[in-house]
């Protein structure tokens, strides 16, 4: 028997593997959504809570309020307009805004998992779907839609489709401030990706599109408040996210772990402990990316670690782990 005849069956058996991996990701997406939905229904039935009681808390209140009334509430300008606009658009046919947001996050979580599958294979996509904070990809938070457009922006950039990458990054920049960090990381990728100098300049010029989106929002806030720092001021007054040195930020976070601190919210101790662990994970991912000379990925995670580490305390780092695709 010839070597070609022996090798042929091996090629035929190897072909279905990518399709099987993709099917596994789809099953993981469906399974995790179903599990979270079942848990939510169980809570609603056993504790006599409404859909809004389960899915309409914390930042969701602000997002839905902006979608309904615009920036009418104090400090609501701390939230970028892209997500509320999407919710309002989908709810125009008469769908309740909460359901519109949940529908969007369902679709966006699938799109984000698909991008991760392209970037890192089935293990990366499934790990993202199984992450403890993946619950925020079911409630109407920004994580799902941001990850969808940001991950696909990165995938398109690595495929050298910089026009598409810039358009997706522009959407990301309209959704949350993390879009600024995405643009910074894409700029590093544009400079370090192989090619002549003119090509690198052309890549950078594409990024003027998402930069313009951020500039437009800052300009809009200036027309409302006559302050160029309105967004930072809202973050500081509403969520205690003013600037602090790294050691002050760590000290403020550690103080929450002390016995008796915030006695009316004892669960905060465990949340902030997880925030510290998440910061350590982010630092480790940044260092590993630097060692591997993955400069764009190191920038993407590193600038976020710096931003969180120079805030009053570590807050929302647990959710930000969902954005760190190099992990």
Predicted regions and their residues:
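Membrane-lumen/periplasm interface segments of specific transmembrane helices
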Residues: 32-56, 183-188, 192, 199-285, ...
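Short hydrophobic/aromatic helix or loop-helix immediately within or flanking a transmembrane segment
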Residues: 57-95, 246-254, 308
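Transmembrane-helix signature of polytopic, membrane-embedded enzymes
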Residues: 99-100, 116-131, 164, 295-299
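Short acidic/glycine- and proline-prone juxtamembrane loop motifs at membrane-interface regions
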Residues: 139-145, 317
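Transmembrane-helix motifs of polytopic, lipid-linked glycan transferases
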Residues: 89, 100-121, 281-285
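Start-transfer (signal-anchor) and selected internal transmembrane alpha helices
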Residues: 1-44, 202, 206
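Membrane-interface transmembrane helices that cradle and orient dolichyl/undecaprenyl
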Residues: 153-164, 194
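Loop-to-helix entry region of an early transmembrane alpha helix in multi-pass inner-membrane enzymes
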Residues: 81, 85, 93-111, 136, ...
């Amino acid at each position: 028997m010839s070597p070609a005849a022996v090798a042929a069956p091996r090629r035929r058996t190897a072909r279905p593997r990518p399709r099987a991996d993709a099917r596994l990701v789809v099953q993981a997406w469906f399974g995790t959504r179903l599990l979270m939905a079942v848990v939510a229904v169980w809570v609603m039935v056993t504790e006599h809570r409404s859909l809004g009681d389960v899915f309409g808390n914390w930042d969701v209140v602000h997002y839905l309020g902006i979608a309904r009334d615009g920036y009418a509430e104090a400090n609501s300008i701390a939230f970028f307009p892209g997500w509320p606009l999407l919710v309002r658009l989908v709810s125009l046919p008469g769908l309740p805004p909460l359901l519109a947001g949940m529908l969007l996050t369902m679709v966006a979580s699938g799109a984000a998992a698909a991008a991760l599958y392209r970037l890192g294979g089935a293990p990366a996509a499934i790990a993202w779907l199984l992450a403890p904070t993946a619950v925020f990809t079911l409630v109407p938070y920004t994580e799902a839609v941001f990850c969808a457009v940001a991950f696909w922006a990165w995938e398109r950039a690595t495929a050298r489709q910089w026009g598409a990458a810039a358009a997706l990054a522009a959407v990301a920049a309209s959704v949350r401030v993390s879009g600024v960090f995405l643009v910074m990381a894409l700029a590093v990728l544009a400079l370090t990706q192989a090619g002549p100098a003119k090509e690198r300049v052309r890549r950078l010029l594409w990024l003027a599109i998402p930069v313009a989106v951020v500039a437009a929002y800052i300009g809009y806030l200036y027309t409302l408040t006559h302050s160029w720092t309105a967004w930072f001021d809202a973050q500081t007054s509403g969520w205690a996210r003013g600037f602090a040195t790294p050691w002050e930020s760590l000290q403020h976070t550690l103080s929450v772990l002390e016995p008796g601190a915030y006695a009316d919210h004892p669960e905060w101790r465990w949340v902030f402990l997880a925030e510290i662990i998440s910061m350590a994970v982010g630092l480790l991912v940044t260092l590993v990316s630097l060692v591997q000379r993955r400069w764009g990925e190191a920038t993407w995670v590193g600038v976020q670690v710096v931003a969180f580490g120079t805030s009053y305390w570590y807050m929302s780092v647990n959710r930000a782990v969902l954005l760190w695709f190099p992990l």
